[in-house]
């Protein structure tokens, strides 16, 4: 059993520095046969020895078990302040003792010389708490010791909090196409889009041209091409034709003789004096349409006047009406005995025409 604590002894003189310990052996890296060397078991605690006289610091032994708390001893007499000793090795932290009675403060001792930096030794057994000495100056930092063996794995810590959400990963590859779903109902019609920009101008088109017959003249207007000139002919029998007129060229082509009776016999159209009526085929470039406006002598706005004349027809049977140029229309009469006669105006419901008035006409192109 542990005896009662004795009175505190007087402070002994400072001990001398211990000899430098041998450098510990460290297996690093571990041998190939030992990927991770486990820590060895702790040594058995040694028995607590009787307090001996202060001697030179011995080699530190393993830490013994903590003994039971002893009875509170009587405060000892204050010892003479000792001379400042050289900084010793850090000892293991002892248990907190009872608060002793404050002793009188001793005189400040002289500052001792600065000792050499010693190597850090193993932790010694906790000594008896001595009298508080005058604080010494901080010693120099010791050299960094070699890395010790890895200790046993600690107990798992509590689960940490969820970290902040990381950035989105790259998009994965497209999955296979799913089956075609049923056709949905037609949605409402969207708003009308804006008018698009005007497209580029197209290539210029070719200049058009139109061919027409100028009845009653053998000369085309200025600037137009004379395709051919001739005279007007018609059927000699009202039963053989529909009353249309032809502009037959003055230069006849040679045709082989017919072995059968001809279907249509032609004859010249004459004026009041028995003269043939001329005609000419004209080519008007840059135009595409030719139209005859009856009972008029002026073309509409934007049209070109080809010639002005009189409306004429065959008085013997109904058929084609011609706009005969005024150059030759003055030579036609209104008598029905002629092959071609001008058309006179008769009384109309909406207008008051005189019987002697003729119907004018104008041929226009655009």
UniProtKB/Swiss-Prot annotation:
Stretches of the chain forming a coiled coil according to its record: none
Biased composition range(s): Low complexity: 1-14, 75-90, 99-110, 150-168, 189-201
Subcellular location: Secreted, Extracellular space, Extracellular matrix
InterPro entries assigned: Collagen, Collagen_superfamily
Keywords: Collagen, Extracellular matrix, Hydroxylation, Repeat, Secreted
Gene Ontology terms: cellular component: collagen trimer; extracellular matrix; extracellular space
UniProt keyword Iron-sulfur, yes or no: no
Protein name (database record): Short-chain collagen C4
Pfam families the UniProt entry points to: Collagen (PF01391)
Region annotated Disordered, chain positions: 1-207
Record's compositionally biased regions (Basic and acidic residues): 138-149
Biased composition (Pro residues): 28-45
Taxonomic lineage of the native organism: Eukaryota, Metazoa, Porifera, Demospongiae, Heteroscleromorpha
Primary location: secreted
Region annotated Triple-helical region, chain positions: 1-23, 40-210
């Amino acid at each position: 059993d542990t005896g009662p604590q004795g009175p505190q002894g007087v402070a002994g003189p400072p001990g001398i520095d211990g000899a430098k310990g041998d450098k510990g052996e460290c297996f690093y890296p571990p041998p190939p046969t030992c990927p991770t060397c486990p820590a060895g078991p702790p040594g058995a605690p040694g028995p607590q020895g009787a307090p001996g006289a202060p001697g030179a610091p011995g080699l530190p032994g393993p830490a013994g078990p903590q003994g039971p708390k002893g009875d509170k001893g009587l405060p000892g007499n204050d010892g003479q302040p000792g001379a400042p000793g050289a900084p010793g090795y850090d000892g293991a932290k002892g248990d907190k003792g009872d608060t002793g009675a404050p002793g009188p403060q001793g005189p400040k001792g002289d500052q001792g010389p600065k000792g050499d930096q010693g190597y850090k030794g193993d932790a010694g057994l906790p000594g008896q708490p001595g009298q508080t000495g005058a604080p010494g100056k901080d010693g120099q930092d010791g050299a960094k010791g070699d890395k010790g063996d890895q200790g046993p794995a600690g107990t798992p810590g509590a689960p940490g909090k969820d970290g902040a959400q990381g950035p989105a990963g790259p998009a994965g590859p497209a999955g296979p196409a799913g089956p075609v779903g049923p056709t949905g109902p037609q949605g409402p019609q969207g708003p009308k889009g804006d008018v698009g920009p005007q497209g580029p101008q197209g290539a210029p088109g070719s200049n058009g041209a139109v061919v027409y017959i100028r009845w009653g003249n053998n000369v085309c207007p200025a600037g137009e091409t004379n395709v051919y000139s001739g005279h007007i002919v018609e059927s000699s029998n009202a039963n053989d034709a529909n009353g249309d007129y032809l502009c037959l060229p003055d230069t006849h082509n040679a045709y082989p003789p017919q072995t059968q009776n001809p279907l249509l016999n032609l004859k010249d159209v004459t004026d009041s004096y028995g003269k043939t009526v001329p005609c000419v085929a004209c080519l008007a470039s840059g135009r595409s349409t030719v139209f005859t406006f009856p009972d008029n002598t002026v073309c509409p706005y934007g049209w070109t006047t080809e010639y002005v004349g009189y409306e004429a027809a065959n008085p013997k049977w109904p058929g084609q009406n011609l706009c005969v140029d005024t150059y030759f229309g003055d030579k036609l009469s209104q008598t029905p005995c002629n092959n071609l006669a001008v058309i006179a105006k008769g009384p109309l419901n909406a207008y008051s025409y005189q019987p002697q008035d003729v119907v004018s006409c104008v041929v226009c192109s655009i």
